Swiss-Prot record:
It is a multi-pass membrane protein. Interacts with the Sec translocase complex via SecD. Specifically interacts with transmembrane segments of nascent integral membrane proteins during membrane integration. Keywords: Cell inner membrane, Cell membrane, Chaperone, Membrane, Protein transport, Transmembrane, Transmembrane helix, Transport. Pfam families: 60KD_IMP (PF02096), YidC_periplas (PF14849). It comes from Alkalilimnicola ehrlichii (strain ATCC BAA-1101 / DSM 17681 / MLHE-1). GO terms for cellular component: plasma membrane. This is Membrane protein insertase YidC. Residues 33-71 are annotated as: Disordered. Belongs to the OXA1/ALB3/YidC family. Type 1 subfamily. Its main location: membrane. Residues 35-58 have a biased composition (Acidic residues). InterPro entries: Membr_insert_YidC, Membr_insert_YidC_N, YidC/ALB3/OXA1/COX18, YidC/Oxa/ALB_C, YidC_ALB_C, YidC_periplasmic_sf. It is found in: Cell inner membrane. The gene is yidC.
Length: 562
């Protein structure tokens, strides 16, 4: 009876822990920020001397530039992995389609990560700031040599060159975008040449602008974080929600860090050169838009001199091998919650097995088998305890009938029975306790790992990261739960009996919302548990039968002697 109560409590705890995990991930302490005066500015101050920054214009296109809007052009760049558009207005990256990732499991249309013509808006911006009103920021009009670039066979990279000039001051700026084959990285380089008579002093900035996802974008039963994030060696990985940006604006000097806008499976991130100190900032803009970026220190370019400002933009899936190549800490953007220490080894194991078998579903089955083998002895102890509980079930029923409503006397008599039969009433709960963190860790692995996005298994399961479209796996899982209950000792309390009978139905309904890969894990785990429990119970019954036969034979022999 105690075993059943514990099982019921732990089973329901799975639901509570999943809900708590979602709440905990969404209500972490906000990033420490500096209070700043609210403004509509979308151009940052320089890293080292923010008080010297010129007054920036607001986020709208200045009146002096509105007549030039018609001159804006879009430069299309197509590689083996990306199809993107760069606007000559500021050189913004305003559209990015990921050619190797479909919109859904059944729609091969490339997934659009960045766009400026829909909700949510998501674009990348960069520019240079100096003391002049005419400056090459993200509102300036650049010139492009061509309207389209395509990576041809035999080519390893594409370079897109945009130019801007202030003839009155003799300042010439070239912005060069470089995209490599088999890469989601866009290298951005500002080249400043001073052909004038006076020195030029300015700084660069690199930022991401987006707004929150519209309500209803993701189902209520799937929680993923969408918002900003920064990394620094001192404070490690920090998430910055849009609400945090509304409350306060970040302004922090960071060396050897990065800043990103992250969402489910994908991210856009500025990753500056190593050891470069930059000022990281956030802004809440009008129109429900938010800016996260970084600005460099001022540089001085003497007449006849040149200077460069460089950065890297990653726009793509959170594939951990690629992220690790960019920066050791970039894999932290794949957020597995408070069980990261368990989830990362699980993903590593899944990933390596998948490399061998070539199927993520088969990898999940094999990982489940390995986990079961790792805890085989622990589970065996539990199932032996359950088998003993089942064997003394008739005697427990007699105790209940004898003591009636005297629960204290009943509990005392049951404890004496447990002691006499050497039964640990809590022995069956330990494997369940062990499975709960594994279950939750695997849940986040399946939910957060883009490697499993749209990963097929077999037959009707074409996406292990989404729910079973025909609910076959949840129904089978519910059937295995019901079968497991038949192997366990039944509760003495009629109310508990009804609750335990309803539990497989409740869990079947809940698992209909879970990713198919997670249901597959639970189904296989239940099947292996049933097989192990049946094997142990059969052996114990054989042992008991052998003991009874020996005892009977001994009694007969004794009678013959008498």
């Amino acid at each position: 009876m105690e075993n059943q109560r514990i099982f019921l409590f732990l089973a329901l705890s799975i639901l509570g822990l999943l809900l708590w995990t979602s709440w905990e991930r969404d209500t972490r302490a906000p990033v420490a920020t500096e209070e700043v005066v609210e403004a509509e500015d979308d151009v940052p101050a320089p890293a080292e001397t923010p008080d010297e920054a010129p007054d920036p214009a607001d986020g709208e296109t200045p009146a002096r530039d509105r007549a030039e809007v018609e001159d804006e052009r879009r430069v299309r760049v197509v590689t083996d992995l990306m199809d993107l558009e760069i606007s000559t207005r500021g050189g913004d990256i305003r559209r990015v389609d990921l050619l190797q990732h479909g919109t859904t499991a059944t729609d091969d249309t490339p997934f659009r990560l960045m766009a400026d013509d829909r909700d949510p808006l998501f674009i990348a911006q960069t520019g240079l700031i100096d003391d002049s009103d005419n400056r090459p920021d993200h509102r300036a009009l650049f010139r492009a040599e061509r309207d389209e670039y395509r990576l041809s066979e035999g080519e390893d990279e594409i370079q897109v060159r945009l130019t801007w000039a202030d003839e009155n001051r003799g300042i010439e700026v070239a912005r060069v975008y470089t995209v490599q084959r088999d890469s989601y990285v866009i290298d951005v380089r500002h080249q400043v040449r001073n052909a004038g008579d006076e020195e030029w002093r300015g700084y660069s900035y690199f930022q991401l602008r987006r707004n929150p996802d519209p309500p209803g974008t993701t189902p209520w039963y799937i929680y993923t974080f969408t918002g900003g994030s920064i990394y620094s060696p001192d404070d490690r990985f920090e998430k910055i929600s849009f609400d945090d940006m509304d409350d306060t604006s970040l302004s922090r000097d960071i060396r050897d860090g990065w800043a990103a806008m992250i969402q489910h499976y994908f991210l856009g991130a500025w990753i500056p050169p190593e050891s470069q100190a930059l000022r990281y900032y956030t802004r809440a803009q009008a129109g429900n838009e938010y800016v996260l970026g970084m600005s460099s220190g001022r540089q001085t370019v003497q007449p006849g001199g040149e200077a460069e400002f460089v950065n890297r933009l990653f726009v793509g899936p959170k594939e951990q091998d690629r992220l690790r190549e960019l920066h050791d800490s970039m894999t932290l953007s794949v957020d597995y919650g408070f069980l990261t220490v368990l989830a990362k080894p699980l993903f590593w194991l899944l990933d390596n097995i998948q490399d061998i078998v070539g199927n993520w579903g088969v990898a999940i089955i094999l990982v489940t088998l390995l986990i079961k083998l790792a805890f085989y002895k622990l589970s065996a102890t539990s199932y032996r305890s359950m088998a003993k509980m089942r064997r003394v079930q008739p005697r427990m029923q007699q105790l209940k009938e004898r003591h009636g409503d005297d629960k204290q006397a009943l509990n005392q008599a049951m404890m004496e029975l447990y002691k006499k039969e050497k039964i640990n009433p809590l022995g069956g709960c330990l494997p369940i306790l062990v499975q709960i963190p594994v279950f939750i860790a695997l849940y986040w692995v399946l939910l957060e790992s883009v490697e499993l996005r749209h990963a097929p298994f077999m037959l009707w399961i074409q996406d292990l990261s989404s729910r079973d479209p025909y609910f076959v796996l949840p129904l089978l899982m519910g059937a295995t739960m019901f079968l497991q209950q038949r192997l366990n000792p039944a509760p003495l309390d009629p109310i508990q009996q009804r609750i335990m009978m309803a539990l497989p139905i409740v869990f079947t309904g809940f698992f209909m919302l879970f990713p198919a890969g997670l249901v597959l894990y639970w189904l296989v785990n239940n099947g292996l548990s049933i097989a192990q429990q049946w094997y142990i119970m059969r052996n114990l019954e054989a042992i008991e039968a052998g003991k009874a036969a020996k005892s009977g034979k001994a009694d007969k022999d004794q009678k013959k002697k008498d």
